[in-house]
Design a protein with these regions (language model features):
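Short, glycine/polar-rich helix-capping loops at beta-to-alpha or helix-loop-helix junctions
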Residues: 188-198
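Short, acidic loop-to-helix structural element flanking the phosphoryl-transfer center
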Residues: 80-108, 114-118, 146
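Helix-loop "lid/cap" segments that line or gate small-molecule binding pockets
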Residues: 27-28, 48-63, 120, 152-153
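Active-site neighborhood of HAD-like aspartate-dependent phosphohydrolases
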Residues: 1-43
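Short acidic-hydrophobic, aromatic-tinged amphipathic segments that line or gate anion-handling sites
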Residues: 203-207
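Substrate-recognition "cap/lid" segment bordering the active-site pocket of phosphatases
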Residues: 84-87, 113-166, 170-179, 193-195
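Metal-dependent phosphoesterase signature
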Residues: 31, 55-94
Length: 218
């Protein structure tokens, strides 16, 4: 029986793509660089903000100094506008409350910067729904490396044999599997069925309630 569910953030709990794309395109426009569609941004996110910035920055020039400056621009812009269009996916708040009522603890593990994770989760979900919220931190490898996930499970006392990881991308499925956990794909997120299936998702959720059903069957 699953007793702990660890969630990815972007594309799983929250639909953040419009605010991420707007911030990225704002930076691009400031420099006269090409901009991108929201659909294109869906395939740029997932590996952390530094990698996102690298992906939307032109290859020439792409020096470490330029990338660092662009990262600072993006981070400031996104932090100021991260709640303009972002919203929880329909059914997510209800799922979290249902899991809590059944004694299933939940936590967040994201490649988004740790301070941003805490702020955005608190804004949309308040306190009490998550045992812990952890994003990328200096010295801790990002997903799909399982090191941060191990640390999170130890922090909240999660039994690895009774823990499920849920996310919307191949990175999330790999993260769960690298940590020895079953990994469930969220079909409402940024990537879709083909990528999640190819990554070896143990199950797929078409709607958030499917996560609860999966746990009940387990």
């Amino acid at each position: 029986m699953i007793k702990t569910v660890l969630f990815d953030l972007d594309g799983t709990l929250l639909n953040t793509i419009d605010d991420l794309a707007d911030a990225g395109n704002w930076v691009c426009a400031q420099h006269g660089w090409p901009t991108f569609t929201v659909e294109q941004f869906k395939h740029m996110v997932g590996n952390g903000i530094p990698k996102l910035v690298e992906r939307f920055s032109p290859e020439n020039p792409r020096t470490p100094e330029q990338l660092a400056a662009t990262l600072a621009e993006f981070t400031a812009r996104y932090d100021a506008h991260k709640e303009d269009k972002t919203a929880p996916y329909p059914g997510i708040p209800e799922l979290l409350d249902e899991l809590r009522a059944q004694g299933v603890q939940c936590a967040v593990f994201s490649n988004k910067a740790d301070p941003l994770c805490g702020k955005i989760i608190a804004h949309y979900f308040g306190t009490g729904r998550f045992a812990a919220v952890r994003g990328s931190r200096p010295g801790v490898p990002t997903k799909p490396d399982p090191a941060g996930l191990y640390a999170l499970m130890d922090e909240i006392g999660a039994d690895r044999s009774a823990t499920l990881f849920v996310g919307d991308s191949d990175v999330d499925i790999l993260t769960g599997h690298n940590a020895g956990l079953p990994a469930m794909g969220a079909l409402w997120g940024f990537r879709g069925r083909a990528e999640l299936t190819a990554a070896g998702a143990d199950a797929l959720a078409a709607v958030p309630e499917d996560i609860f059903t999966y746990i009940q069957k387990g």
